[in-house]
């Protein structure tokens, strides 16, 4: 039986995440997780991965919509962003792109990624 995005968000601590966009993509299959903080993240991603990030690399990206398109093409199943240290909030450009791409985008509450 495949594990889906809608399944992993029922598990703590992901159950504390807030869905920002891409609700229609919650049936995407999850194979593994990846934590990345580099601008060219798509070269490190595999189909079915869930991407976790604190947004450090977003400061170097001019077009966050294009970033979302690249990771969606790489086959990412969902994106979890942890605002706080590098971002005050998930940028609107990412939210709009995720909705258009049907790519689930979540905001994580204040917690360490080690708990994932």
PLM feature spans:
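Alpha-helical/coil-rich non-catalytic "connector" segments in signaling and regulatory proteins
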Residues: 1-114
């Amino acid at each position: 039986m495949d594990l889906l995005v809608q399944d992993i968000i029922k598990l703590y601590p992901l159950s504390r995440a807030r869905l920002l966009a891409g609700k229609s993509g919650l049936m995407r299959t999850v194979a593994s997780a990846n934590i990345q903080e580099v601008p060219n993240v798509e070269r490190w991603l595999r189909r079915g991965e869930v991407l976790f990030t604190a947004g450090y690399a977003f400061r170097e990206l001019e077009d966050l919509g294009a970033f979302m398109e690249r990771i969606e093409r790489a086959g990412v199943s969902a994106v979890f962003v942890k605002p706080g240290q590098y971002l005050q909030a998930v940028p609107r450009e990412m939210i709009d792109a995720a909705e258009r791409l049907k790519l689930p985008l979540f905001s994580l509450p204040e917690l360490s990624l080690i708990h994932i």
